[in-house]
Design a protein with these regions (language model features):
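Cytochrome P450 core scaffold surrounding the K-helix E-X-X-R motif
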Residues: 525-529
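Generic long, charged, amphipathic alpha-helical segments
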Residues: 422, 572-596
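Active-site "cap" helix and flanking loop/linker of ATP-utilizing ligase/carboxylase catalytic domains
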Residues: 531-567
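Amphipathic, heptad-repeat alpha-helical segments used for oligomerization and assembly
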Residues: 267, 441, 585-603
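Structural alpha/beta core scaffold segments of enzyme domains
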Residues: 1-521, 579-583, 611-618, 622, ...
Length: 644
């Protein structure tokens, strides 16, 4: 294929060795000699955008994969109306998914002659499509099966071992197995995008927001992956869940020779929120205004237009979520004013306590005009009464408990105990596509497809069909892409809403931050399985904790330096917050199944800026980059005259 002879990143695969043993494969690998012609490379996205920079792809001038613009109102007039202007440049880093099970898979020829790949992934039919494209095979010759596994977080959204497995079995006609080591996993799959966000906000003395000007640069790495979709989310979230009459955004995702970046829990939301919520907290401090009160003064409500010219989809609960989180965290409402006392301080002046607040919203589904569908088949078996319900669904279970929730929703839709439901899942040979298990979409999409299939199956049952089968494909409400000039669009059909209060204790001499308490209010629409919802909230907070304070992914000239979990530190049991209060709110999503909306990504989004605000509350020092490691904190504290 055109361009396939160019190595653009250390993640590119050069050769495939298949052997009977690992030792034989290693010996064969060591015999390979590759002749390279060195090409110029670029690793900084700002440098990559300049004229004369090395070009990674012929169709991307100045290495710009995409440029999104938003032009709403009159930005100059908005700043002229402002009494105060807050500016900041925010930088976020790569993040490794660090799921406990590294990439692995098995391939073979099944009884119908299909190349069959059993692997962990997030979209069976997309994996099938990409294998077919790579091997030039028709879909009926390729089968993909997903076993349930313990984690993905977006890291299994793109190709890893799937095509290599299929290629080996297709060529040899034999079963093939592959298991990546941890080092191979860290080097071999995409990461969360690093972002540079320059933000300038204007507001009146009473806290009314007047203008926001934002410039975003995202490092896509060497290939596109999901970078354009991640950037779209960041554009939506870079001004937070707040109303601005005047907005000017320029957002770019840029090719570099770094390893590719792609889907990761939050999908652009954490990067956008880090800038937006820091701006909001800085504005509150500059105005001498409570951060909760300032948010409630400007928060998006039902029918209020966003900065892309259209309101959020029906079912907006952001004000209620902020209020409930604040109350649970000790804020008091006095008329329109909100207040919270500063946490009591330790007697030892070395350690200081503070509390920070953050809010966020996140789309459910890819949206931005992408067609969103999910297929389900329900088969009812029995005689006079329904004795068994078989649900066929392609949705993957990647540790979030999707298949349990599928069974619960099928039982509710059919009207039988959940014990009568059997789920046949994640096999391209049994059911149509469900779309990706990502973007917090699967409960919403699967639930609606399951309800539709149940209605059809029950109708067939009433017509005396045995077995009674219902086959239904749900189509989500239509959305639209950014207008190329104004950015105006109807980007998403559903949203989830979250707010967090984080209390920390900071040691100004060592830079160590201990998170004492987290209150997380999350509107889930309807908690189909409350235990799983609570687990998702706590899991997202732990993962966000690593992003905020610990996980320092390092790359130099495209080479990953932190290839081991001994050098890339993720939270352990002694690192996580002491206490997490999960506040599960249920404001029904009008289009959601049983009122449910997606929720698993949302608790990640406001955590890092809430931690930054808590550190500021404790020490008076702002941090505009993450991770906020002890070394970086100590350096900043010393500059501020804190500690030794």
């Amino acid at each position: 294929k055109e361009g396939a002879d160019i190595v653009r990143t250390t993640m590119d695969q050069i050769a495939c060795v298949i052997a009977e043993t690992e030792e034989a494969a290693a010996r064969a690998r060591d015999l390979i000699r590759v002749e390279y012609e060195d090409l110029p490379a670029v690793f900084d996205p700002i440098e990559a955008m300049q004229d004369g920079a090395p070009q990674l792809h012929a169709d991307a001038k100045n290495n710009i994969l995409v440029h999104y613009k938003v032009r709403t109102g009159d930005i100059e007039e908005g700043f002229a109306d402002a009494d105060i202007v807050i500016e900041g440049t925010y930088r976020t880093s790569w993040q490794e998914h660090a799921y406990l099970q590294p990439e692995a898979g098995l391939s073979y020829i099944d009884e119908e002659g299909r190349v069959t790949v059993e692997v962990a992934g997030q979209w069976t039919h997309k994996d099938q499509q990409q294998i077919c494209h790579a091997l030039d095979l028709p879909p009926e010759k390729v089968r993909v099966i997903y076993p349930a596994i313990g984690g993905a977080f977006g890291g299994r959204e793109d190709m890893s071992v799937q095509i290599v497995l299929a290629l080996a079995t297709w060529k040899l006609g034999r079963p093939v197995k592959i298991i990546w080591s941890r080092e191979e996993s860290i080097r071999g799959h995409h990461k969360r995008h690093p972002y540079i966000i320059e933000a300038k906000w204007g507001a009146k003395r009473d806290g009314t927001l007047t203008a926001a000007k934002v410039r975003i640069i995202s490092d896509a790495g060497a290939y596109a992956y999901t970078s354009t979709k991640v950037l779209g989310n960041a554009v939506m979230m870079c001004v937070g869940p707040y109303y601005f009459p005047n907005v000017h955004v320029d957002a770019y995702t840029v090719y570099t020779n770094n390893i590719p970046t792609g889907a990761f829990r939050g999908f652009g939301g954490p990067q956008g929120a880090f800038a937006a919520e820091n701006q909001m907290n800085k504005l509150a401090a500059a105005l001498g205004m409570d951060p909760v009160e300032l948010r409630l003064k400007n928060v998006l409500r039902e029918g209020v237009p966003t900065h892309v010219g259209t309101p959020l989809s029906p079912g907006v609960s952001m004000p209620e979520v902020i209020e409930e989180c604040a109350r649970r965290a000790g804020w008091r409402q006095e008329g329109e004013n909100w207040r919270r006392e500063k946490p009591p301080q330790p007697e030892n002046g070395v350690k200081r306590r503070g509390i920070g607040f953050g809010a966020g919203f996140k789309n459910v589904g890819f949206s931005f005009g992408a067609p969103e569908t999910a297929n389900a088949i329900i088969e009812l078996r029995g005689g006079a009464e329904i004795e068994e319900v078989i649900l066929y669904h392609a949705g993957a279970d990647v540790g979030q408990g999707a298949h349990t929730v599928f069974a619960q929703m099928a039982a509710e839709a059919v009207g039988v105990p959940v014990e009568k439901v059997r789920v046949v899942a994640s096999d391209t040979a049994t059911v149509g596509s469900s779309g990706s298990v990502s973007a917090s979409r699967m409960t919403f999409m699967a639930g609606n497809s399951i309800r539709g299939a149940a209605e059809k199956a029950l109708e067939a049952w009433r017509n005396e069909e045995r077995p009674a089968i219902g086959n239904y494909t749900y189509h989500a409400p239509k959305t639209s892409m950014f207008d190329p000039e104004t950015g105006h669009c109807y980007p998403n059909f559903s949203y989830g809403y979250v707010a967090q209060a984080v209390e920390v204790e900071v040691d100004v001499e060592t830079g160590f931050v201990e998170v004492l308490n987290v209150v997380c209010a999350d509107d889930v629409g309807k908690a189909i399985n409350p235990q799983q919802v609570e687990g998702q909230i706590e899991g997202a907070i732990v993962q966000a904790h690593g992003y905020a304070l610990m996980e320092d992914f390092q790359m130099r000239d495209g080479h990953v330096l932190t290839q081991h979990l001994s050098t890339y530190l993720i939270p352990g049991v002694l690192d996580v917050p002491r206490h997490v209060e999960s506040v599960i709110l249920e404001y029904a999503e009008p289009n959601g199944p049983f009122g449910a909306r997606g929720m698993a990504e949302m608790p990640f989004i406001p955590y890092t800026p809430a931690v930054a605000a808590a550190i500021y509350d404790a020490t008076g020092v702002w941090f505009d980059s993450q991770p906020m490691t002890p070394q970086r904190l100590v350096e900043a504290f010393r500059k501020a005259g804190l500690g030794n």
